[in-house]
Amino acid sequence: WEIDPATRKVKAKITVGREPVAMASFAGDSCLLIANNMPEMPSTAYPLAAQLDIVDVSSKKVASRIMLPNGSTDVKSIAVDKNRAYAYVTHLIARYQLPTNQLDRGWMATNTLSIIDLKARKLLTSVLLDTPQKGAANPWSVIVTPDDKQIIVAAAGSQELVRIDRIALHERLAKAKQGVMVTPSVKSWNNIPNDAGFLYGIRDFIPTQGKGPRSVVATGNKIYTANYYTSELVSMDMNGKNLNKQVLGAPLAFTKVGKGDMYFHDATICFQNWQSCATCHPNDARMDGLNWDLLNDGMGNPKNTKTLLLSHQTPPCMATGI
């Protein structure tokens, strides 16, 4: 919606994709990049992924669309650099075409940062926030620090911040584009979205010492994040050191409902922090728009993820009657 701040009235409504959740301006504020949370095509389509919309502000119409990699869902946040040359988008890449028989190395889901070339208006590539042995589950907010040197992602499921050397990232991408084997695991440019080793050496993890870091900001020489479930404001220096916490009110986790919601979104109780319940059932335990082949009714019959809303009162939960 375009709202006139003087009259507080809606001036225009612009139709975009499914469940828009974030936006950022670029091209001298003449365009908006819109993040749509969910895939909008049928779950039997290919590719099946959430899309970004580029809105022309003057015409108030979608000028073009950018599709994220196949399996992309639960898009959360957008950040841009100072020059507005690149945008960084947090989301999941679900490996929904594989059987759900293991979690190792992101077999079911990987946690992703997609990089958008705003001048070319296309997807540059997507990099995995995970390592081969550890997930950075449920990436939420993303920022670029004021000096443009770091990208910070709040990994809400694994209870940490992911700190990436932005300068080194783009240098590595430029070399990989030329065919240089920038890390031992890099096989080709097109394989980067599947390579959990691509960020090796230029990314670290900063535990927030609480539950549910969903937002992150950086001002001056400080990084701030908020632990949603434990009601804490956390500050640290730009290197992720000298961490301080301040409790703000009664933690949500003190209530029975809040504690259950916390566990639902907590990937630290999962093998190697790869995923939480919210990975497949985001947005208050709803669906992710994908088909999955769960093994409790055999293999080879993928079905659309169901919302969990009232599912305990409406059995059976599987399409085959289980």
Show where each model-derived region lies.
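Periplasmic c-type cytochrome electron-transfer domains
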Residues: 8, 64, 76-102, 109-112, ...
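Extracytoplasmic/lumenal domain signature
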Residues: 3-8, 55, 59-61
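Asp-box/WD-like beta-propeller blade repeats and closely related beta-sheet repeat scaffolds
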Residues: 10-24, 38-40, 47-50, 62-77
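Beta-propeller blade termini and top-face loops
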Residues: 5, 19-21, 34-53, 89-102, ...
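Gly/Ser/Thr-rich loops at beta-strand to alpha-helix junctions
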Residues: 3, 25, 53-55, 158
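A structural detector for beta-sheet-dominated domains
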Residues: 15-17, 26, 35, 55-58, ...
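A short, structured loop/turn motif at beta-sheet edges
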Residues: 25-27, 56-59, 80-86
